[in-house]
Amino acid sequence: MNRKHVFDQTFFEKVDTEEKAYILGFIYADGCNVKHPTTAELSIAQMERDVDILYKIKDAIKSTYPISERKGDLSGDEKYFVFYIYGKHLGEQLNKLGVTQRKSLTLTFPEFLDDTLMPHFIRGYFDGDGSVWEGKRKKMVVKNDHRPGEYRERIVHNVKFNFTGSSTFIPYLQKYLIEKYGFSETKLNYSKAKDDHRHCTMEYSGRKNLYKLYDIMYSSATIYGERKKAKFEKILCALSEKSLSEMGLIAGTPETVISSEAEKSERSTTIPGMEVGGSLPKCPTLSE
């Protein structure tokens, strides 16, 4: 099999580029490194809606191995695709980078990565085991600070993102986001798995956190999953220009609703890279 197909066997000897960091992050989330008697097998499976990621990995690693279509045993009757690569040296490289044969029991945060590459690693992991969504919006009646005695309606956007993974990985990802990017500490949710290890979910809500994560992951990105980036931008673009102005992220009307001293403090906090002209998605609706 190895004689029929080729790939860049030195790809992971040194993780020193955006592509390598992103793909390593994705493999941390969704890859499987299996040792065989004479070789090793890297396998990555994705549903059809995210198959573009497999082709990007295939191109980056210069592989001639095919991406195979399957159906039935991953998620009901929906089609999915699997990318296999075989190589003993590749397996050894991934093992040294933390992708062991039973990584759900051993996976730890890759502190060996340079900070300049960490956003790409995080984006790769997010494309594998992260989610972003908007729940039902709510209306609140609040005081109008510019017109004493009057009230107005305020739309509360219920936007969230999360990362899921092992209990040996997610807490350290959160620690990095707190120390490097100023995220607050949130409660982590744990659940037991069949193989006696614990799954862990880290969830954040609020527009400010979404903009912050978007900027971290996509401000200089050239490789990413199309679907999740588009979903992220659809949610962000659904926030009106007025909402952005209230957050102090773009020029516009002054902030009109501050419900508490804590909220004042939160809103005055600078978001790295999110000043006026920062890395917001290009939304044609923002100026309407």
Predicted features and spans:
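Internal intein/HINT superfamily modules and their associated LAGLIDADG
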Residues: 1-288
